[in-house]
Amino acid sequence: MATPEEKAKALEAALGQIEKQFGKGAIMKLGETQKLDIEAISTGSLSLDVALGIGGLPMGRIVEIFGPESSGKTTLTLSVIAQAQKAGKTCAFIDAEHALDPIYAAKLGVDVKELLISQPDNGEQALEICDALVRSGAVDVVIVDSVAALTPKAEIEGEMGDTHVGLQARLMSQALRKLTGQIKNSNCLVVFINQIRMKIGVVFGNPETTTGGNALKFYASVRLDIRRVGSIKNGDEVIGNETRVKVVKNKVAPPFRQVDFQILYGEGISRNGELIELGVKHKLVNKSGAWFSYEGEKIGQGKTNAMKWLAEHPEQAAILEQKLRSELLANPEKALLADLEAESESNISEVESDF
């Protein structure tokens, strides 16, 4: 029977052989690094970046964004592209739905001249293009819009009444098996947009499910459930949506965080609105009655006027955002406690209003 010293030597020799054959980092002890240094790309929403725990969507991983129609899925991914391009990264958009509006994308801050776009004929072609872009190592962000539109070639070439049971699910499973290793090696962020469907005959539990089988649920490091929960009105005119995003899966930070933010038509995510709300919540912006003040200076009566002040003073807005980002990402527990306090206060006010 081998002694502990002999076992340690044998293990060291085996690890050395594995690293020699497969390269440095092929195998390591989990406790060697206290914290995984994961590069992230901002989503364009400060509150969502904080909820994700690392400041955005993780590079070198697969992300799924799903939700009902007109919930803001494409808007959120275009916002990710805009933030990535600002950081000097190369982005590609695989438009399987053939529905990308370049004018709207430009309004959200996307440099459409530099954006790579493909409108494939079928699901196999879309996933092959995605694989080629990832393998090149030259593309940093790939968006696939959407999984539901990745129609297998056999289905397109077949008759209307033909049944193709599980064909799309098998296609996704095979593609993800190929992609997942290459995505890590190339440090590319791949985002799949997905739609939801209703499962027939479900009596107990949630009847909603996403398209394309279960493979994407397993391979995705982050899954975001995005919903429209209300409308933003200016008088009688609807000018945007109240949007709620729940982090239903997160392999790089604690999951199940939930955030609300505004998406304004023609503008995208309301950055200044988030700065005001988060600033008040974390006591960087003072609110007294209807008045908001920042660093001792009154910036507006009502949230709309405070947002206008930030829009007119971009330097101050950038400083406030940097303060919030550094404070909340360095202390995620503080952000979580502030969310819980705000939620409990809203619940108390609702109970009081009932009486």
From Swiss-Prot:
GO terms for biological process: DNA recombination; DNA repair; SOS response. PANTHER family: MITOCHONDRIAL DNA REPAIR PROTEIN RECA HOMOLOG-RELATED (PTHR45900:SF1), RECA (PTHR45900). InterPro entries: AAA+_ATPase, DNA_recomb/repair_RecA, DNA_recomb/repair_RecA_CS, P-loop_NTPase, RecA-like_C, RecA-like_N, RecA_ATP-bd, RecA_C_sf. ATP binds at residues 67-74. PROSITE patterns: RECA_1, RECA_2, RECA_3. SMART domains: AAA (SM00382). One of its GO terms (cellular component) is cytosol. HAMAP family: RecA. Gene3D superfamilies: P-loop containing nucleotide triphosphate hydrolases. GO terms for molecular function: ATP binding; ATP hydrolysis activity; ATP-dependent DNA damage sensor activity; damaged DNA binding; single-stranded DNA binding. Pfam families: RecA, RecA_C. Keywords: ATP-binding, Cytoplasm, DNA damage, DNA recombination, DNA repair, DNA-binding, Nucleotide-binding, SOS response. It is found in: Cytoplasm. NCBIfam families: tigrfam_recA. SUPFAM superfamilies: P-loop containing nucleoside triphosphate hydrolases, RecA protein, C-terminal domain. The keyword DNA damage applies. It comes from the Bacteria. Can catalyze the hydrolysis of ATP in the presence of single-stranded DNA, the ATP-dependent uptake of single-stranded DNA by duplex DNA, and the ATP-dependent hybridization of homologous single-stranded DNAs. It interacts with LexA causing its activation and leading to its autocatalytic cleavage. This is Protein RecA. Belongs to the RecA family.
